[in-house]
Amino acid sequence: MKKLSVIMLALLMSIGAMAGEKDEYFTLNSGFLFNNTLNATFGYERELNYGNAVELFGEVGNQWQRDPVCGKVCNESFWKGYYWDGGLLYKHSLKKFKNGNFRLRIGPQFGAHTGDYFFAVEGGFEYNYVFRSGIQFSLIQKNQVSFLHGDSFRNGLLIGLKIPF
């Protein structure tokens, strides 16, 4: 019996367990990007070991400009700068807090901007605060460099929620 309890204790000590490991979330973020861009992002996130995570996401946005005819942003000109894309992000944990974490986000994106296809690379930072219910509040600083079309650089802030399931 003593031998069995020593083996069980050694087995329990060798198995690593972390809070939040393998959790899954539905993410929803929105915000403004430079230059005159409104952005909304939705996705699926899976937590990995040591606070790292992977996110598969899609986003839609609109870059508005002044209409040369009416001299301001009009209904006719507002929706002409739309884009959509999707991608995969790896989120490396830089710092863990009691109820939150700070991560580096990096990954590729593919999509279309007013009919022209593009490839992009996204990088940035993310801070998450975890509420008692498991829902997370996110503050995201985003930098996106796009290739193969004129709108080559976007950066800005997004806020959002992560809902566990």
What are the functions of these language-model segments?
Residues 1-23, 165:
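Cleavable N-terminal export/targeting peptides
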Residues 8, 23, 54-82, 110-114, ...:
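Flexible, solvent-exposed loop segments that connect beta-strands
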Residues 19-23, 50-51, 94-102, 115, ...:
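Short loop/turn motifs that connect adjacent beta-strands in outer-membrane beta-barrel proteins
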Residues 19-66, 162-164:
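Short glycine/proline- and aromatic-enriched beta-strand/turn motifs that initiate or cap beta-hairpins
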Residues 28-32, 56-62, 88, 104-112, ...:
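Transmembrane beta-barrel strands of outer-membrane/channel proteins
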Residues 28-41, 80-82, 110-121, 145-154:
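Solvent-exposed loop/turn segments connecting transmembrane beta-strands
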Residues 46, 90-94, 110, 127-129, ...:
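Residue-level signature of outer-membrane beta-barrel architecture
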Residues 86, 153-165:
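Outer-membrane beta-barrel "beta-signal"
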